[in-house]
């Protein structure tokens, strides 16, 4: 039913939203809060009220028969109580039907109120002589429950309570004023009744207001907790997608656990890691096939591309290759420029790994052929495949990239280098694994690649089964069109590749706060497949917002079900059903130690109730010295308690507060923040009020007690004059019922301490109830009995002071107990939601930080911000062109000789452990402030690639002073020599003699992020290619730079030595320079010293 109502409301809200903005969603939220308020507060309380009233009716019948009262004398009572019981039972049955209750909520409230008022008047009119104090306690009960237990709103509750109290006052005033002999003390009694009713109205309104505020806070906390839970799930999904887009699942979870542990910090009792080595996330896998593929002709094409075109082409091409890899059970490892390599057989071994790689190679050639035929652009694929064993995983601390290492990987790389465009070049080992699945022909790879010749590798070309092999002169047959002839090759490529619709990198990322705002968004959909205009994005944002609202509302409905009336009495995971204690002792301790700034207002309300008790007793009691002294002492005590509670605020308002009064300021803070002072003050305050309610009853004069007759008025031993005298004395004791009413107000004063320990309030009220019953039924029973017998010939239950007092006190005790328990339950529930929200918020922050760490481990910080920003640009490809970026390649050529695969070093694993230490130590340098501008790009085997100048805004590059504009090139040189120093330190500890070979170049580059499956930040351009050549043609322990770079370095104070002219592959003859080692090191030391 709730679900149907919710859907109907959602439909109405959607229509309203279309007509008037966000009204619909607000209406949906309003209904949700109404449902929450109805089922969590109103429903349980009205059920409890009906149970209390029905229990009271049964108790009244039981007491009636227990006292042996004559049925003939109390027919009205015996008709009224069972009839009321039947009516309330029928209402109770209907209320328990949730759909009926929600539909007839106001009707039930009105019927119960009318029935209670009618019962009050029936008890008043048909019980004998009507007195001014008649049914005050019953009408006080009606007033109090109208506020606290009946589902009226505040306005309706005030109206109903005022009508109840004013009707009682008016009826009695009119009736008794016309009754002979009842006018003597009528005014003071009616005035006392008014004060009691005013007190009941104020206490009820106070209780209702605070409970509604508490419930609203609980609702908000529930919403916040559920929102945070949805966001946490979203963050976890996003983090998993992000992590799995960077690393394979088998290694990702292990690294994730370590990152989370690092983010959360060391926990108590957890042993610190005493291992001197960094963790190595590398595993060995056997029987895999490795594919290397290079796009032939792409370098020439790239020189004609704009930055956007280059990044778009690479993303589309490699996106297509990723799709082909997935179809053929291959895992892409890395993209190196325009080179793509992948492995089949990871992480789970596959018997057909060789077939998968060969099939993928053929599909890649076929895809490029289609591009070539459609665009007329002269590009092709050169593919090499080899099978064997690999070590795979991640090394270093930053910019993780999943990679593979082994001699077989090196051989696969040379299979590609020794191949032919448009063909799949395989080794004899791969051929054996194919088991005749493909026809092959001689490859003669040793002719084209010295490495293959040196290692005597027999190679073959796979014949594509889809068609006969074409001769090289027919491989390129451009399709000329009128439009194509007018367009650049890069434009033709870009337009054609758009039709592939490759996914964009990090398209699933959204802003970290998107789910905690009012207009929050949540994305659980797959990554988009292509460009969308702004309107489409806006539409999708609205649908995401709608999905988020629907999910939040669905979970709120579940939460409302979870805190329904019956649920708090059933077994709960967090709260014990009887005591309401938390199962978790730490949470229980935290709850009890919670600060309570509102405590002073509880004391204030209790003091107001005490003031009402004082006014009532002053109005009706004889004016005695004991009365004055007792209330005077009580007033002074309560005023002092009030002053201590409010001292903090009073002294803060006063500019001339004395230093001697500072202890009061501290005391006020201690009371608000510590439980034991609050408990002590609660006990003292309630004890004073409860005691003063009956204190003066013990000081009635002897004459007032002894002159009362001990039997009814018809006693034969009492003369008529004596009887008249007794009746007159009895009328002078009209104040006796007001002691009972004061006791009831005293019990109500206990309930105003809403967030004080429930068991403490229960104990105080129980002690008070027992004490009051001892007074009423034992110590002063003869006074009350005699007074009732003098006024009434056959007093019924509600006319007999002793019985009426005991029953009324018991009813109020049970009512206040239920309200106290209800209040305690929701206070604890609110605390629990806040506690869960706090923990989930911390977990969300950990997940957000984890996502940021993961993203910044792939991208530079400024690029990561681009993808984490609020804007919707993260659906577009990121690319940026720079005019001056310094690129460094630093390699350890000796590591190739050091790397061996044997049982001693666990088939090369221990060699990689050393490489991991080297790269990790290099990465440590990046955290130093002086190298904050250095951006690690990637590692390629034992080569470390980094760049500076990528953090500057391109438009601001030329705005800088010339010297400052090139400072980052000097930073790169300093970083290179810091790498040399790190490597020297590692050599000393590992007894090796590795030397670093460094190549540096500067100039324009294009930066971008490509690949949706494994997004990768990279830089491209001639500057990068030349820097790589500076390394590969360099000399050990030297930094080789181009002539242009050397001129810049010399202006920065570095000394460069000309090496001469060398031949650089693809670039011809270049004049290069070596940076002076000693000069650089001295500069580095001076910088560190400064």
UniProtKB/Swiss-Prot annotation:
Q: What EC number(s) does the entry state?
A: 4.6.1.1
Q: Where in the cell is it found?
A: Membrane; Cell membrane; Cytoplasm
> Keyword set for this entry?
ATP-binding, cAMP biosynthesis, Cell membrane, Cytoplasm, Glycoprotein, Lyase, Magnesium, Manganese, Membrane, Metal-binding, Nucleotide-binding, Phosphoprotein, Repeat, Transmembrane, Transmembrane helix
Alphabetical GO CC annotations of the entry are: cytoplasm; dendrite; membrane; plasma membrane
* Control of this protein's activity: Activated by forskolin. Is not activated by calmodulin. Inhibited by calcium ions, already at micromolar concentration. Activated by the G protein alpha subunit GNAS. Activated by the G protein beta and gamma subunit complex. Phosphorylation by RAF1 results in its activation. Phosphorylation by PKC activates the enzyme.
Q: What PTM annotation applies here?
A: Phosphorylated by RAF1.
One Pfam family named in its UniProt record:
Guanylate_cyc
Can you tell me which residues bind ATP?
294-299, 336-338, 382, 938, 1018-1020, 1025-1029, 1065
Example GO molecular function term?
adenylate cyclase activity
**Highest taxon listed in the record's lineage:** Eukaryota
Topology versus the membrane, per the UniProt entry?
A: Multi-pass membrane protein
Do you know which InterPro entries this protein is assigned to? A/G_cyclase (IPR001054), A/G_cyclase_CS (IPR018297), AC_N (IPR032628), Adcy (IPR030672), Adcy_conserved_dom (IPR009398), Nucleotide_cyclase (IPR029787)
Residues recorded with modification Phosphoserine: 490, 543
**Amino acids binding Mg(2+) 2:** 294-295, 338
Cofactor(s) for this UniProt protein: Mg(2+); Mn(2+)
**Could you tell me which residue ranges are on the Cytoplasmic side of the membrane?**
1-44, 207-600, 821-1090
**Which reaction(s) does its UniProt entry say it catalyses?**
ATP = 3',5'-cyclic AMP + diphosphate
Known glycosylation sites: 712, 717, 723
Interaction with GNAS as annotated region, ranges: 904-921, 989-992
Annotated positions binding Mg(2+) 1: 294, 338
Q: How is the cofactor bound?
A: Binds 2 magnesium ions per subunit. Is also active with manganese (in vitro).
What's the stated role of this polypeptide? Answer: Catalyzes the formation of the signaling molecule cAMP in response to G-protein signaling. Down-stream signaling cascades mediate changes in gene expression patterns and lead to increased IL6 production. Functions in signaling cascades downstream of the muscarinic acetylcholine receptors.
Q: What does the entry's free-text domain comment contain?
A: The protein contains two modules with six transmembrane helices each; both are required for catalytic activity. Isolated N-terminal or C-terminal guanylate cyclase domains have no catalytic activity, but when they are brought together, enzyme activity is restored. The active site is at the interface of the two domains. Both contribute substrate-binding residues, but the catalytic metal ions are bound exclusively via the N-terminal guanylate cyclase domain.
- Tell me the protein's name: Adenylate cyclase type 2
Q: Report the source organism.
A: Mus musculus (Mouse)
